[in-house]
């Protein structure tokens, strides 16, 4: 057996090997050690190898999916070695000692999952292949759980943004690329494949073969890099399926001109689909997700990741949202019907992958039925939006398949097909007869129990069944002697503690009839299952289109529901360079405030070609960063086809969105906080066009004051004069306000704050003009800095402001300030203070624990009287 294991393990390469033994998948050697640690299961041993025990652990087959999920989450890949013949077939082939044949039937990786238990129903599961041809790059991406398949040709500079958009579960790349220092951290944890797996001509040939076409012209013109990426992707899928490819829809070629460009840094800072902690909660998608199906949630995430550039398509989406927005009853009816709709795309994915079950077929039947009910409800409506007219035909045309599945399957089929019982009565008369025969035999067996009790006088006699003995008679040990007699008519089979088991000729005959009928019935049902799956897969493209249409309907109705509940409005999206928002709100922050019973302070934004750059000043915590992000998110929502949180909004098409907000570092790539800031700012200045929207927060703060001011000054000028884009620029450098005299499209704005009875009140309101001060020390007081530090800061600030007013050398004046030591401390805590005196008199080394406790209480009383600390 171990020889067979070694052979299979060699094929598995870097994967853990699940080796089937009976009802368990066993792991050996280092695989066992690694798996037992991850799964927290017992590590045992079996036999020896080179005079050492072989480590072993195992998981039951019926629970294998849950264990697989944990291993995949831990970053493992698992090869499944299953039995490919029965023990009976093995004996027939090689005698009683023949080893059952096993083979690797599948390799399970993070990007090749199809099982419902292993996937997040509300998130896509992308497998991405990266390839390079010359200076060009290509990506090929597939979600095999739904069949989605897309490619994109891109430059090296856009690689990070596309990988960030897809948020792939698994990335594969040529070994020559991954091993280059420049890409090790840009393609993290990529699976290395040999360079031969990324061959452009071979990729083209594979595509033609899969879709049975002679030319790719109907799909578009693929670049060499795209075809190489396709080849790598299909090679990995071929390995994972051991020669069986999953369902893939026709590849969709993405073009940058079709979607708003959002780089990786901007996606992260705006938290579009994941918070800074990497969770869905707290992100934009989580705050606006009112979808009721997993497919709808996945499409919503995809839409937010790629806002549209086609105004006509944006308007079509907005029209459908508005249609549901104003018809409450229709919206609620549609959403109720969608709630009961199965995930057709993932059901189809399992069927194509060969892992479909009778339950999956019933889900498909019910889902297509729901689609037709929706069709009937929506088709008769007047003044339907164009997008609804476009997707409605995909809801119908499945009648023959639904009729077949309704006739063939019972209402609630089991997941496990091996025990039969899922084909409906009346679908196959021969099957019905076998079931009848089996039923008669089982009834006869039940009657035999009463007969044997009467014959033997043993009232506790029972007829039982198990997988080893089949049907048998069981009596308590004290009654066994009578049945042991040669003329009793019973044959001894097994003796256990407390019971003895027997057989009888009549029981044996009936058992054979029941077993044969059952085996034949299961065989017939298995054939029917295969035929039903084959008939279903003939309609795979139509089913996939229906699934996509249901998801689009769910997203649109969900947008409408969100807009109604949160008082959002339809934006006007046009080809101008305006950005005019009345009473706009931050969708995520407002959502959090509403939950805590607070109100979000709305603000206006008005950018146009003559007033396209706002310089925003004001205190920390005043809401500058929130205001910046809020407007960026409004652009994303509008071009996604959603209503927006505002009273009114007109948004000129944004081709590229950039955000330089928040401080972070990238130690893995050797970059400090300031270096990251400069790299991101450089990307903005080199890529932003006059149609872009840019938010910049505190540029230059990561270095010395004068260096930072100089950089910020130059960046403002470049954004104004060279990029000429719409930009919100938040800063604490008040010197930048002088630029209004030189830059005609720049205007000054600030977030309002006021002092009330010695406290700082942050109003979170935008107003014209520059802030008169930054209120930094007041914010520090709100944050809880010690009074002694605040006092010292006030002294330093006063000296700096005084020297600035006199236009003197501030460094010379600062040298006159006392050091932040005893002298500075005494300016806050004079020596004649009782608390100071009490502390000075202490001899800490001579105190007992009791004395120390008494002194603590005394000091607390003194502090209460004289609120110094």
Curated annotation (Swiss-Prot):
Q: Provide any one GO MF term from the record.
A: damaged DNA binding
The entry's keywords? ATP-binding, DNA damage, DNA repair, DNA-binding, Nucleotide-binding
Q: Which residues form the signal peptide?
A: none
* GO CC terms, sorted: cytosol
Residues that hold ATP according to the record: 618-625
Set out the biological process GO terms recorded for this chain's protein.
mismatch repair
The family annotation for this protein states: Belongs to the DNA mismatch repair MutS family.
- Describe the function of this protein: This protein is involved in the repair of mismatches in DNA. It is possible that it carries out the mismatch recognition step. This protein has a weak ATPase activity.
Indicate what this protein is called per its UniProt record: DNA mismatch repair protein MutS
């Amino acid at each position: 057996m171990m020889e067979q294991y070694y052979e299979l393990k060699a094929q598995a390469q870097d994967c853990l090997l699940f080796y089937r033994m009976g009802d368990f998948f066993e792991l050996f050697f280092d695989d066992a050690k690694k798996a037992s640690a991850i799964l927290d299961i017992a590590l045992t041993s079996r036999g020896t190898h080179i005079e050492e025990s072989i480590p072993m652990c195992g998981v039951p087959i019926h629970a294998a999916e849950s264990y697989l999920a944990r291993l995949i989450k831990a970053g493992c890949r698992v090869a499944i070695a299953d039995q490919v013949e029965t023990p009976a077939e093995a004996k027939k082939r090689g005698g009683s000692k023949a080893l059952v044949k096993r083979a690797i039937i599948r390799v399970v990786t993070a990007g090749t999952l199809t099982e419902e238990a292993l996937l997040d129903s509300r998130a896509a599961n992308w497998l991405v292949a990266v390839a390079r041809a010359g200076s060009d790059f290509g990506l090929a991406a597939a979600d095999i759980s739904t069949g989605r398949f897309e490619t994109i040709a891109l430059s090296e500079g856009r690689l990070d943004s596309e990988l960030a958009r897809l948020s792939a579960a698994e990335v594969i790349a040529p070994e020559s690329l991954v091993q280059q220092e420049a890409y090790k951290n840009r393609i993290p944890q990529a699976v290395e494949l040999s360079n031969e797996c990324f061959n452009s001509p071979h990729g083209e040939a594979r595509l033609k073969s899969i879709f049975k076409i002679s030319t790719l012209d109907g799909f578009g013109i693929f670049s060499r890099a795209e075809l190489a990426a396709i080849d790598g992707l299909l090679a990995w899928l071929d390995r994972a399926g051991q020669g069986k490819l999953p369902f893939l829809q026709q590849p969709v070629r993405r073009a940058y001109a079709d979607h708003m460009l959002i780089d990786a840094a901007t996606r992260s800072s705006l938290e579009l689909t994941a918070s800074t902690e990497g969770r869905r909660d707290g992100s934009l998608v989580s705050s606006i997700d009112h979808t009721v199906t997993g497919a709808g949630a996945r499409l919503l995430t995809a839409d937010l990741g790629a806002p549209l550039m086609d105004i006509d398509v944006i308007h079509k989406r907005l029209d459908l949202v508005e249609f549901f927005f104003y018809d409450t009853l229709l919206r609620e009816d549609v959403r109720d019907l969608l709630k009961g709709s199965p995930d057709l795309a993932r059901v189809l994915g399992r069927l194509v992958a060969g892992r479909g079950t009778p339950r999956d077929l019933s889900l498909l039947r019910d889902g297509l039925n729901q689609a037709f009910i929706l069709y009937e409800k929506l088709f008769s409506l007047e003044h339907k939006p164009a997008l609804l007219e476009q997707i409605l035909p995909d809801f119908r045309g499945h009648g023959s398949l639904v009729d077949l599945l309704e006739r063939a399957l019972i209402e609630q089929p089991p997941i496990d097909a091996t025990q039969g019982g899922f084909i409906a009565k009346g679908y196959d008369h021969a099957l019905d007869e076998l079931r009848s025969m089996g039923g008669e035999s089982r009834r006869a067996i039940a009657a035999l129990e009463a007969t044997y009790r009467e014959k033997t006088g043993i009232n506790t006699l029972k007829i039982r069944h198990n997988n080893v003995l089949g049907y048998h008679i069981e009596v308590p040990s004290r009654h066994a002697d009578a049945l042991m007699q040669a003329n009793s008519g019973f044959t001894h089979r097994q003796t256990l503690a407390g019971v003895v088991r027997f057989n009888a000729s009549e029981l044996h005959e009936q058992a054979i009839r029941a077993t044969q009928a059952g085996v034949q019935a299961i065989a017939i049902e298995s054939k029917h299952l295969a035929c039903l799956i084959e008939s279903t897969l003939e309609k795979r493209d139509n089913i996939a289109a229906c699934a996509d249409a249901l998801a689009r309907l769910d997203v649109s109705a969900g947008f409408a529901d969100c807009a109604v509940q949160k008082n959002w409005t339809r934006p006007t999206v046009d080809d101008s360079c305006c950005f005019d928002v009345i009473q706009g709100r931050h969708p995520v922050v407002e959502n959090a405030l509403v939950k805590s019973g607070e109100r979000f302070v709305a603000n206006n934004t008005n950018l146009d070609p003559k007033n396209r750059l706002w310089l925003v000043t004001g205190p920390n915590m005043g809401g500058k960063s929130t205001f910046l992000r809020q407007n960026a998110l409004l652009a994303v929502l509008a071009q996604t086809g959603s209503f927006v949180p505002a009273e009114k909004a007109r948004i000129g098409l944004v081709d590229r969105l950039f955000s330089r907000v928040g401080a972070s570092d990238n130690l893995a790539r050797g970059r400090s906080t300031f270096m990251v800031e400069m790299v991101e700012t450089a990307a903005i200045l080199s890529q932003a066009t006059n149609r872009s929207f840019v938010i910049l927060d505190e540029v230059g703060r990561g270095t010395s004051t004068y260096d930072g001011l100089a950089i910020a000054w130059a960046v403002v000028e470049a954004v104004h004069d060279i990029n000429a884009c719409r930009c919100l620029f938040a800063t604490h450098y008040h010197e930048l306000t002088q630029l209004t005299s030189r830059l005609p499209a720049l205007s000054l704005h600030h977030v309002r704050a006021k002092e009330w009875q010695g406290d700082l009140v942050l109003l979170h309101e935008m107003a014209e003009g520059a802030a008169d001060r930054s209120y930094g020390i007041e914010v520090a007081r709100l944050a809880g800095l010690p009074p002694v530090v605040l006092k010292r800061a006030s002294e330093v600030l006063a000296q700096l402001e005084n020297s600035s007013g006199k236009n003197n050398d501030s460094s010379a004046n600062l040298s006159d300030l006392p050091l932040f030591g005893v002298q500075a401390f005494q300016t806050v805590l004079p020596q004649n203070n009782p608390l100071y005196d009490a502390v000075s008199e202490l001899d800490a080394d001579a105190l007992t624990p009791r004395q120390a406790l008494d002194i603590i209480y005394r000091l607390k009383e003194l502090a209460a009287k004289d609120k110094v600390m």
